[in-house]
């Protein structure tokens, strides 16, 4: 079924104005709650042990760095920060335990809703777990910290293996947006391919390759080609990267799209007329699934998130509807999708969920 979506804006973490709209909703029948108790759940991946690892933005904090370093422009900034981010894991039976906590977490200004970011995503290289930080940096209220890639050690400690704050500051993109510029970046999603990590940064607009402990290389300056379109989601199909975007405020109908980026950085648009993309994933048959945060509303609205499957050129089949402020998704070993739900916003703490979406057999 082809759908002409009305775009809603998901703006948390990305330096764009946000209003959370509450409403009544009903999830599609193939959606169930798999686990609860998360603080702003974000990217999630299954590990080699069969457990699901969930990154959490945390609950922000009250520490300020005003007067110490450059701040994110108002009304998004100034940020405050704390060490409330964490990574949790969920067993196949739904039992939740903490892998590592006390990681950097920040929140926007009160005028912007105290919206939280922290650990943005996780990925495995072999049996080693890595985390993508978006909640650190002096511009986010935490002096002496940096956004980057953390290696999670067997004893639960972490080691910084790539300083992405430093990389951004010394390798500017062609077309940064000064009105909401984030010095430390607002990293969003990460995938592993061939033992290398690939991460998307929405505020600057880039896809970067990270060799843990070695070096960082920009694969594509999306801002140079597309301008400030706020790329968020990345998936890899074994040959190329696929990147989805939110687009910017004010709202424009059907403004999100999916782009293909080759390992050489060549970019082409492959799917259009989508809304508020926050997740992409391929199934075992190579079919692409798209997670939309909101549709049919002018602002992010609970109960209007959806998962679509690409069935031909700009034809999309609904797989799940009625999701509430979803932020990421991944396929499980059972062939079903797992989605971070109630994944952004201010407290209450512990309101985040992971949903299980049974994917139709067709």
Indicate where each model-derived feature is located.
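A short loop-to-beta-strand structural motif that recurs across blades of beta-propeller domains
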Residues: 75, 83-88, 147-150, 206-209, ...
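Residue position within the beta-strands of beta-propeller blades
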Residues: 53-57, 130-133, 199, 242-245, ...
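Beta-propeller fold detector
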Residues: 32-33, 96-103, 156-167, 217-223, ...
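Generic structural signal for coil-to-beta-strand starts
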Residues: 51, 95, 127-130, 148, ...
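Beta-rich, blade/repeat-based domains predominating
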Residues: 37-49, 83-84, 105-128, 146, ...
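Blade-loop segments of beta-propeller domains
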Residues: 69-92, 96-123
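Short glycine/acidic-enriched loop and turn motifs that connect beta-strands
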Residues: 59-63, 136-140, 204-206, 248-251, ...
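Short loop/turn segments that connect beta-strands within beta-propeller blades
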Residues: 90-95, 152-157, 211-215, 261-266, ...
């Amino acid at each position: 079924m082809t759908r002409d979506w009305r775009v809603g804006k998901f703006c948390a973490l990305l330096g764009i104005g946000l209003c959370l709209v509450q409403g009544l909703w009903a999830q599609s029948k193939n959606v169930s709650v798999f686990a609860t108790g998360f603080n702003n759940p974000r990217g999630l991946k299954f590990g080699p042990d069969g457990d699901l690892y969930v990154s959490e933005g945390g609950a922000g904090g009250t520490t300020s760095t005003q007067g110490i370093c450059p701040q994110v422009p108002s009304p998004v900034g100034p940020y405050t920060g704390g060490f409330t981010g964490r990574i949790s894991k969920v067993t196949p039976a739904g039992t939740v335990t903490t892998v590592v906590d006390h990681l950097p977490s920040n929140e926007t200004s009160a005028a912007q809703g105290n919206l939280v970011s922290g650990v943005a995503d996780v990925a495995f290289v072999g049996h080693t777990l890595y985390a993508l930080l978006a909640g650190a940096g002096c511009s986010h209220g935490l002096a002496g910290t940096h956004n980057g890639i953390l290696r999670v050690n067997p004893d639960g400690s972490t080691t910084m293996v790539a300083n992405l704050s430093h990389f951004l500051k010394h390798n500017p993109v062609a077309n940064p947006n000064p009105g909401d510029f984030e010095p430390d970046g607002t990293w969003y999603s990460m995938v592993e391919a061939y033992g290398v990590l690939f991460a998307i940064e929405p505020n600057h607009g880039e896809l970067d390759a990270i060799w843990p402990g070695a070096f960082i290389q920009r694969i594509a300056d999306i801002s140079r080609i597309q301008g400030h379109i706020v790329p968020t989601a990345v998936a890899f199909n074994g040959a190329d990267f696929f990147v989805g975007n939110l687009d910017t405020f004010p709202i424009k109908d059907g403004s999100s799209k999916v782009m293909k980026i080759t390992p050489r950085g060549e970019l082409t648009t492959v799917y259009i007329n989508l809304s508020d993309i926050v997740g992409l994933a391929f199934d075992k048959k190579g079919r692409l699934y798209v997670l939309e945060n909101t549709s049919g509303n002018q602002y992010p609205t609970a109960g209007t998130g959806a998962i679509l499957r690409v069935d031909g050129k700009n034809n999309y089949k609904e797989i799940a509807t009625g999701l509430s402020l979803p932020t990421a998704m991944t396929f499980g070993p059972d062939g079903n999708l797992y989605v971070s739900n109630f994944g952004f916003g201010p407290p209450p703490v512990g309101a985040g969920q992971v949903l299980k979406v049974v994917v139709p057999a067709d």
